């Protein structure tokens, strides 16, 4: 069956303008429907979800109005907004509740404390791989000697050494294939 060039053109227009077509559906149509449904069912969690969504939608709209010129330089912005609003809207993710509880509500409850948290800069340099003292064998040995004394540490080493010698003399071989003295 030959393809109709008119159908191809319509499909191309739909694909090119996906964000323009999907954004109103995701940001307005579905939330309006779900909000009315939540009002009619008188479900408090659903009411909170959609009230929270509308607060966040208003903040996003204010952000867009304020920064419209710089946002024009980011062609990916409409797609980021679409995915972000999908995260806010879809009940599987419950994004609106998360954003509200962790960002909006603390600011509303205590603005002074919330702004302090936002502008807090740690004084220490962040280390991606912090050294844990528990994993360091030398630190563990030093702690053991501080708690039990050097004589107890030496006794422990001698005891372990004699235990290993006893195992090898009885024919119990505990070698691994990557040990230097392993015999094939």
Swiss-Prot record:
Keywords: Membrane, Transmembrane, Transmembrane helix. One of its GO terms (cellular component) is membrane. The chain crosses the membrane at residues 13-33, 51-71, 73-93. It is a multi-pass membrane protein. Predominantly expressed in flower buds and stem. The keyword Nucleotidyltransferase does not apply. It comes from the Eukaryota. Its main location: membrane. One of its GO terms (biological process) is hyperosmotic salinity response. It is found in: Membrane. Signal peptide: none annotated. It holds the Pfam family TB2_DP1_HVA22. InterPro entries: TB2_DP1_HVA22 (IPR004345). Belongs to the DP1 family. This is HVA22-like protein c. The lineage of its organism: Eukaryota, Viridiplantae, Streptophyta, Embryophyta, Tracheophyta.
